[in-house]
Amino acid sequence: MKLFVVLACLAAPGTFPFVDAATVIPANSFSSFSTYWNNFYPWGTDHNGSGRMASANIIVASNTLSLIATPTSNPSPPTSTSNPKPAIHYASGAIHAKEHITVTAANAYTVSGEFSAPTAVGTWPAFWLTAVSGWPPEVDIGEWKGTADNWFNTFNTSSVVKSTLVDWPTDLSFHSVKAVLTAQSNNKDVKIDFYMDNKFIVTQYGSGFVGKAMYLIINLQMEGSSGSPGPSGRTVYKARNVQVTRTGN
């Protein structure tokens, strides 16, 4: 009780003191895949690139997720069912977490993982949060768009976007990214602190993100914003030690 009183005195007005941490998704979650994850995007197999997700392209071994893109021919239907309905050129992989992430005055979240991300033209891997209902919010913790950069992005609208680029190695070595999401004292906006390899990179803000449920998605999309033509061979995007913790009162 004394500890609670001290923390309550230190808490910002309009927020709750954070005294507990709960593991929402443990770092070894891929070893219990069906407990924590579903295949594909929350809305299905297609999105805004030329990759269509397939179960055979989602591989888990030794607590490491591998999403594999391979060229495909004669896809049916031949174009994506999602806007802008690009032609399908690849079979690939995506997963999403069963648990939604909802930042409130009482609950902050830390979302992290280690990734071996391809950076070749036409490869578009991502590790991101997006709205369960409507859009935005969107927070891109990892997004690689055919260059040796990771993009940290926060979308407040389609035109109000904050992006910070950091160098990303091209040798497919694993590196960590992390986002810490905390409600602001106005109980409307969310502060997002981004890290790479445990080094703080930048703070961005999500306007009106408090109370908005978000999906966590890991996917290997192709072409689209990463350019074209994409690779003629196999592309692999790996993830490990993906973890989500919730801190609350």
Swiss-Prot record:
Q: Which residues are glycosylated?
A: 48, 156
Q: What is its EC number?
A: 3.2.1.181
- What would changing residue 143 to D do, according to UniProt? Loss of galactan endo-beta-1,3-galactanase activity
The UniProt PTM text for this protein says: N-glycosylated.
EC top class named in words: hydrolase
UniProt temperature dependence: Optimum temperature is 50 degrees Celsius.
Q: List, from the UniProt record, the residues annotated as the active site of this protein.
A: 138, 143
Where would one find the signal peptide in this protein? 1-21
Question: What is the pH dependence?
Answer: Optimum pH is 4.0-6.0.
Residue span(s) of domain GH16: 34-247
Q: Which GO terms describe its molecular function?
A: hydrolase activity, hydrolyzing O-glycosyl compounds
* UniProt keyword annotations, A-Z: Glycoprotein, Glycosidase, Hydrolase, Signal
Q: Which reaction does it catalyse?
A: The enzyme specifically hydrolyzes beta-1,3-galactan and beta-1,3-galactooligosaccharides
- GO biological process entries: carbohydrate metabolic process
Which branch of life, at top level?
Eukaryota
InterPro entries named in the record: ConA-like_dom_sf, GH16
Give the record's family classification. Answer: Belongs to the glycosyl hydrolase 16 family.
- What is the protein's known function? Specifically hydrolyzes beta-1,3-galactan in an endo-fashion. Requires at least 3 contiguous beta-1,3-residues.
Q: What is this protein called?
A: Galactan endo-beta-1,3-galactanase
Q: What is the lineage of its organism?
A: Eukaryota, Fungi, Dikarya, Basidiomycota, Agaricomycotina
Gene this chain is encoded by: EN3GAL
